[in-house]
């Protein structure tokens, strides 16, 4: 669905970095690891939240 506001494991705020990460790493040609380093997302649990997230709102919305 939508990116969670906080990391499930440590509670650190990750939602504020999602838009920039999506623009630079997913739609651009930059390395996701370098983008996360520049954004200050350094914990492996928070990085997992950003890298593994898939936006499924458009897929699920027709069924509601």
From Swiss-Prot:
Record EC number: 2.7.7.6
GO cellular component entries: cytoplasm; DNA-directed RNA polymerase complex
InterPro entries from the UniProt entry: RNA_pol_su_RPB10, RNA_pol_suN_Zn-BS, RPABC5/Rpb10
Reaction equations catalysed: RNA(n) + a ribonucleoside 5'-triphosphate = RNA(n+1) + diphosphate
GO biological process, one term: DNA-templated transcription
Coiled-coil annotated spans: none
Cofactor binding: number and manner: Binds 1 zinc ion.
GO molecular function, one term: zinc ion binding
EC supergroup of this enzyme: transferase
Residues that, per the record, bind Zn(2+): 7, 10, 45-46
Co-factor requirement: Zn(2+)
Keyword annotations of the record: Cytoplasm, DNA-directed RNA polymerase, Metal-binding, Nucleotidyltransferase, Transcription, Transferase, Zinc
Cellular compartment(s): Cytoplasm
Role played: DNA-dependent RNA polymerase (RNAP) catalyzes the transcription of DNA into RNA using the four ribonucleoside triphosphates as substrates.
PANTHER family cross-referenced by the UniProt entry: DNA-DIRECTED RNA POLYMERASES I, II, AND III SUBUNIT RPABC5 (PTHR23431:SF3), DNA-DIRECTED RNA POLYMERASES I, II, AND III SUBUNIT RPABC5 FAMILY MEMBER (PTHR23431)
Oligomeric form and interacting partners: Part of the RNA polymerase complex.
Family in the record: Belongs to the archaeal Rpo10/eukaryotic RPB10 RNA polymerase subunit family.
Name recorded for this polypeptide: DNA-directed RNA polymerase subunit Rpo10
Organism the protein comes from: Halorubrum lacusprofundi (strain ATCC 49239 / DSM 5036 / JCM 8891 / ACAM 34)
Lineage of source species: Archaea, Methanobacteriati, Methanobacteriota, Stenosarchaea group, Halobacteria
Encoding gene per record: rpo10
